Amino acid sequence: MAYLYIRDYLRQIQSSQLNQLTGSDNAILSTLELTAIEEANSYLVQKYDTAYEFTDITAWDAAVSYQGQRRVYLYAADYVSTNTYASGSIVANNNKVYYLTASKTGAWTTANTTLLGDLYQVFNVKTPYMVWDAEELYGIGNQVWWHDKVYTCLNQNTGLAPDDSDNAQYWGLGTSWSLTAGTLPSDSTKWNAADNRSQQLVTYIVNIVLYYLSKRIAPQNIPINVITAYENAINWLMAAAGDKAGITANIPRIQPKKGYRTRMSSIPRNNNTY
């Protein structure tokens, strides 16, 4: 799982310092990131849809068909004038990332290229329909996107999850949906030019990882600012997981809400209007 990418760490630590902590071993960083996510998940899992929030962020690949709300970042090696690039290649120039619409070599020009965005810019896939909401009233024929599928409402309902087999009379079976491979992130009809992760959570996960990295190097001499950042992260996780007012984390909540409704029979009452 890669919930973080290198740019997240560079907000808080220089690359040279990060390499000192990891010994330039990215496997250590990946392992401790999993540990940090597991720790955060233990606080949040009862209240938030952590399975969704902690999905990967990966470098965009034209060969991959991405599902709704999946996130990617732009990355490519710098263009080298002595190389010959095939059509469909991705290159970087002056911190911009380009998609080549024809083969290219020689001095850099923007001819036969499509600008995708800035190096490391994050995008997420737009869903084909609105995301299902437990508090919305749906009528016959309404379509929603939920957990990588498109569902059609068969009977008026509210609060009935489309992917719950008990609700088969209210929703169709659902059709898997994903974006056509090769759809460029610059296509604003298909992609959002935005990072849909909780930025607070990203910061706190980074703080937890840096704490574990420092502990690995010198367990008896962890910098006080690293300890404080770790403690702040844990305190925030505890507050976000609690029911007390004060912190509303920007993380998708579990739907339907626990205790959202109590059934006194096997079939919920319809919401009828006349």
Predicted regions and their residues:
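Conserved short "hinge" loops at termini or chain/domain junctions
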Residues: M1-S81, T101-T110, L115-E135, G139-I140, ...
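Soluble non-cytosolic domains of exported or imported proteins
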Residues: G23, A27-T31, Y85, Q220, ...
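Core structural elements
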Residues: Q200-I208
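Trihelical helix-turn-helix/Myb-like DNA-binding core that engages the DNA major groove
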Residues: D166
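Short loop/turn elements at secondary-structure junctions
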Residues: W191, N207-Y274
